[in-house]
Regions:
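Short, flexible helix-loop junctions that flank or precede catalytic/ligand sites
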Residues: 1-140
């Protein structure tokens, strides 16, 4: 939303007309044929905001002819969905930074791309490396 203001749209127009904002990224799925369990490094998990105690084992693709030895086959989306609440509207009108808006939205329950990616890692759909490659660190 701050991008619209940066492009010259008046804040009152953005605040009154935008209902929600969606961000998505496509991440590669682990190949089901060559999928194997492994014990991840604690640091790589904590960098993504995943408690290492909750993920004693994860999955990765070993590579096979079915996935052309990449370890991945197919894609899925990770999402971030911001509902424009009255508080967010006030922040837009006050020209608050996108970092501040995002931080407050997370405190109110919004899930970031990284959080959704972490769920997909724990479900064995994708890898730590893939989510790290496609998302920014939640630095707020």
């Amino acid at each position: 939303m701050t991008r619209l203001v940066d492009l010259g749209v008046e804040p009152f127009l953005v605040a009154s007309s935008v209902v929600a904002v969606v961000a998505q990224r496509l991440v590669r799925l682990i190949c089901e044929v060559s999928k194997e369990e492994y014990v991840p490094e604690a640091k790589s998990l904590s960098d993504l905001g995943v408690d290492p105690a909750k993920a004693p084992r994860l999955w990765r693709g070993r590579g096979c002819p079915d996935c052309m030895n990449s370890g991945y086959k197919g894609r899925t989306a990770i999402y971030e969905f911001l509902i424009v609440s009255d508080h967010v509207r006030e922040q837009v009108m006050a020209r608050a930074s996108s970092t501040l808006i995002k931080r407050d939205a997370v405190q109110q329950g919004m899930r970031t791309l990284r959080m959704d990616g972490a769920d997909k890692i724990l479900k064995g759909l994708t890898t730590v490396e893939e989510v790290a490659r496609m998302t920014q660190r939640d630095g707020f």
